[in-house]
Curated annotation (Swiss-Prot):
<dbReference type="GO" id="GO:0008270">
    <property type="term" value="F:zinc ion binding"/>
</dbReference>
<dbReference type="GO" id="GO:0032259">
    <property type="term" value="P:methylation"/>
</dbReference>
<keyword id="KW-0677">Repeat</keyword>
<feature type="binding site">
    <location>
        <position position="599"/>
    </location>
    <ligand>
        <name>L-methionine</name>
    </ligand>
</feature>
<dbReference type="InterPro" id="IPR002629">
    <property type="entry name" value="Met_Synth_C/arc"/>
</dbReference>
<comment type="pathway">
    <text>Amino-acid biosynthesis; L-methionine biosynthesis via de novo pathway; L-methionine from L-homocysteine (MetE route): step 1/1.</text>
</comment>
<feature type="active site" description="Proton donor">
    <location>
        <position position="694"/>
    </location>
</feature>
<comment type="function">
    <text>Catalyzes the transfer of a methyl group from 5-methyltetrahydrofolate to homocysteine resulting in methionine formation.</text>
</comment>
<dbReference type="Pfam" id="PF01717">
    <property type="entry name" value="Meth_synt_2"/>
</dbReference>
<feature type="binding site">
    <location>
        <position position="665"/>
    </location>
    <ligand>
        <name>Zn(2+)</name>
    </ligand>
</feature>
<keyword id="KW-0028">Amino-acid biosynthesis</keyword>
<feature type="binding site">
    <location>
        <position position="599"/>
    </location>
    <ligand>
        <name>L-homocysteine</name>
    </ligand>
</feature>
<feature type="binding site">
    <location>
        <position position="643"/>
    </location>
    <ligand>
        <name>Zn(2+)</name>
    </ligand>
</feature>
<feature type="binding site">
    <location>
        <position position="117"/>
    </location>
    <ligand>
        <name>5-methyltetrahydropteroyltri-L-glutamate</name>
    </ligand>
</feature>
<feature type="binding site">
    <location>
        <begin position="431"/>
        <end position="433"/>
    </location>
    <ligand>
        <name>L-methionine</name>
    </ligand>
</feature>
<feature type="binding site">
    <location>
        <begin position="17"/>
        <end position="20"/>
    </location>
    <ligand>
        <name>5-methyltetrahydropteroyltri-L-glutamate</name>
    </ligand>
</feature>
<keyword id="KW-0862">Zinc</keyword>
Length: 754
């Protein structure tokens, strides 16, 4: 039984973000549809060949997407919201873009479909919409066309399909309420049709992704798998594919299915390989997800070999990435600025393919010398001074319960803060960033490229901060911000100023659609060599008598939006960041900054996939925030900001943060999110966002007043703040001025109405 290699998917965007550039050029009307389609074909052909050359035996086909693979599945099933349908019922690539973006070069604009996080990753998918009595049909044949492409190129392939149960689980009901699981019988004929077409093409194996099987699913959903897979059995061999967690809790459901193989994530799950081997049907293939598809670290292949070698010869075995390599940058070899030592610790998508090939060869031959050679830098890293900082480790070990406690409870602090700031009722503020104009971005780029010296750069940034203060004073805001002109990204900026992080040149990963991010990498113990934000905050405060907020990104968000170390726990990393930023809070306070905002938009999205694991995560996540903030004196007001999310199931933890003020996104939910705070009897102050910054629309005074009155029905008015939903970085100045002017006017009207 020869062991083969495969990946669950490969990055789509291209090494130089070619797909992003082609998409945005097409959307802007600067290139043709044919040019866009040609870029897609070129990228697919290149990526298949690269994986093949790196040693992958079975190439994934169907992992490419023009926007998102869940959206591609929606089109495959003919699931197009009525507002996005073509008059003649046809579908084209613009149909797909209208669903994802709300507009495309052809067709009428309409509200984009909702977007949310793909399980617990930083990738976003387009949420399928379901309605009662909906019909499904195979119309969008992208998968079949790409299979034909790959076969014509002579590749040995494994088509990839998102499974029917997970697809329904990921969607939402629109209109009249009903159980979306009842649609399963209606989508299965489309899956049967697709599998029949693949069988006609001589396909042996199909990877069918059911990551919902790692969740704590309701029994009705678990029960749905057997009839679904009974309907799909018999045409091709099915590799039931799971990832992001282990399958052991749902293994009884899995082993009853008529499939021929199972893929398990042996990185993020706690499944025992020996137990899996014992419980799986003897004729099933086991695909072992041994190489981490979600991180950038070189694997210890000697360890992976030991983990799986006992199964060699006992059952059919493949070695694979834990999940799609979509979540990893493409190619380490093009990184020229990483020093040799650090570079030797990393492996990007192509290098991970090479790791799989090395592991396959060793398992097939029993020769492990190549594995030991590959793994040598990992042994060196374990003892590197770049990784370990004794002072940080000592400080972390010395944390006590007192370090996460403010001096006095909120009621006492609130009195001290009222006496210090003397703010009016309905105080107005913004979330932090102001428009990142072409001038600001150009200034940073020129400085980064060496075209501008430090003095001229600082002079330019100071001028933009000054203008931001002038604008806010002119508008009549009560609590100001410096505008963050010096920051490119809320995580990258802090990573650049903390020891323990490194940055890549081309380490791009897809976030959604054409948006790519370049996460920092945590390589070692984290510390703060010098103050980060103090100078600009102090300068901004010197320009006004009104309070200016200090602006920090919180420890959990920095952790969640970075590539973390694998040799320590996430809790350890978060608390190291918290200690570093605790010193920043103390320095801001010493510099006269009386209000400090610590943003934690990622607190909820970092939750483990299984509800039973939430408490442990929330305990250390909340503690990290409190360690960060608790150094502040009573009269220093601590704010936090959280992006749009459900709060009702984590309200205990939100309250436990003990922030003096929390600002949240609520305008899109018509203040419904405040129900959670009302029901919980949330004790501290709240700033419910009164307008959606993701839209260029300017809200009217009357509309904002109505929202605030609705908020005051749930939260006492004396504890309410007035602010936008989120930062204003992506907006232009004209709509920003107009919207903030109306927001301030609405607050003034409510004060006068008292």
């Amino acid at each position: 039984m020869t062991i083969l290699t495969h990946t669950l998917g490969f990055p789509r965007v291209g090494l130089r973000r070619e797909l992003k550039k082609a998409q945005e050029s097409y959307w802007a009307g600067n290139s043709t549809r044919e040019a866009l389609l040609a870029v897609g074909r070129e990228l697919r052909a290149r990526h298949w060949e690269q994986q093949k050359q790196a040693g992958i035996d079975l190439l994934p086909v169907g992992d490419f997407a023009w926007y998102d693979h869940v959206l591609t599945t929606s089109l495959l099933l003919g699931n197009v919201p009525a507002r996005h349908q073509n008059n003649d019922g046809s579908m084209d690539i613009d149909t797909l873009f209208r669903i994802g973006r709300g507009r495309a070069p052809t067709g009428e604009p309409a509200a984009a479909a909702e977007m949310t996080k793909w399980f617990n990753t930083n990738y976003h998918y387009i949420v399928p919409e379901f309605s009662k009595g909906q019909q499904f049909r195979l119309t969008w044949t992208q998968l079949l066309e790409e299979v034909d492409e790959a076969l014509a190129l002579g590749h040995k392939i494994k088509p990839v399909l998102l499974g029917p149960v997970t697809y329904l689980w990921l969607g939402k009901v629109k209109g009249e309420p009903f159980d979306r699981l009842t649609l399963l019988k209606d989508i299965l004929p489309v899956y049967q049709h697709v599998l029949a077409e693949l069988a006609k093409r001589g396909i042996e194996w199909v990877q069918i992704d059911e990551p919902a099987l790692v969740l704590e699913l309701p029994q009705a959903w678990l029960d749905a798998f057997k009839p679904a897979y009974d309907a799909l059995a018999g045409q091709v061999k099915l590799l039931l594919t799971t990832y992001f967690e282990g399958v052991t809790p749902n293994l009884d459901t899995i082993i009853a299915l008529p499939v021929q193989g199972l893929h398990v994530d042996l990185i993020h799950g706690k499944d025992d390989v020996a137990e899996l081997h014992q419980r799986l049907p003897v004729d099933w293939l086991l695909s072992a997800g041994l190489i981490n598809g979600r991180n950038v670290w070189r694997a210890d292949l000697t360890e992976k070999y030991a983990q799986i070698n006992a199964l060699v010869g006992k059952r059919a075995l493949w070695v694979a990435s834990s999940c799609s390599l979509l979540h990893s940058p493409i190619d380490l070899s093009v990184e020229t600025r990483l020093d040799t030592e650090v570079k030797s610790w990393f492996a990007f998508a192509l290098q991970k393919c090479g790791e799989l090939a090395l592991l396959r060869d060793a398992l097939n031959s029993g020769e492990t010398a190549a594995l030991e050679e590959w793994s040598a830098p990992i042994q060196a890293r374990r003892h590197s001074r770049r990784v370990h900082n004794a002072a940080v480790e000592k400080r972390l070990a010395a944390i006590t319960a007192q370090d996460s406690q403010r001096e006095n409870p909120y009621e006492v602090r609130a009195e001290a803060q009222r006496a210090r700031f003397k703010l009016p009722a309905w105080p107005t503020t913004t979330i932090g960033s102001f428009p990142q104009t072409t001038e600001i971005r150009g200034l940073r780029l020129d400085f980064k490229k060496g075209n501008l010296d430090a003095n001229n750069y600082r002079t330019g940034i100071a001028e933009h901060i000054k203008q931001a203060i002038i604008e806010q004073e002119r508008l009549g805001l009560d609590v100001l911000v410096h505008g963050e002109a010096e920051r490119n990204d809320m995580v990258e900026y802090f990573g650049e100023h903390l020891d323990g992080f490194v940055f890549t040149q081309n380490g791009w990963v897809q976030s959604y659609g054409s948006r790519c991010v370049k996460p920092p990498v945590v390589i070692g113990d984290i510390s703060r060599p010098a103050p980060i934000t103090v100078e600009w905050a102090k300068y901004a405060q010197s320009l006004t008598d009104k309070p200016v907020k200090g602006m920090l990104t919180g420890p959990v968000t920095i952790l969640c939006w970075s590539f973390p170390r694998e040799d320590v726990t996430r809790e350890t990393i978060a608390k190291q960041i918290a200690l570093a930023l605790r010193d920043e809070v103390a320095d801001l306070e010493a510099a006269g900054i009386g209000i400090i905002q610590i943003d934690e938009p990622a607190l909820r999205e970092g939750l483990p996939l299984r509800r039973s694991d939430w408490d442990a995560y929330l305990e250390w996540g909340v503690e990290a925030f409190r360690i960060n903030a608790a150094v502040a004196k009573d009269e220093t007001q601590i704010h936090t900001h959280m992006c749009y999310c459900e709060f009702n199931d984590i309200m205990d933890s939100i309250a436990a943060l003990d922030a003096d003020v929390i600002t949240i996104e609520t305008s899109r939910s018509d203040m419904e999110l405040l129900e959670s705070f009302e029901a919980f009897d949330y004790p501290n102050e709240i700033g419910p966002g009164v307008y959606d910054i993701h839209s260029p629309n300017v809200p009217s005074v009357e509309w904002i007043e109505a929202l605030l009155k609705k908020a005051a029905q749930r939260i006492p008015a004396q504890r309410l703040w007035v602010n936008p939903d989120c930062g204003l970085k992506t907006r232009g100045w004209p709509e920003t001025r107009a919207a903030l002017a109306n927001m301030v006017k609405a607050a003034h009207n409510l004060r006068q109405a008292k």
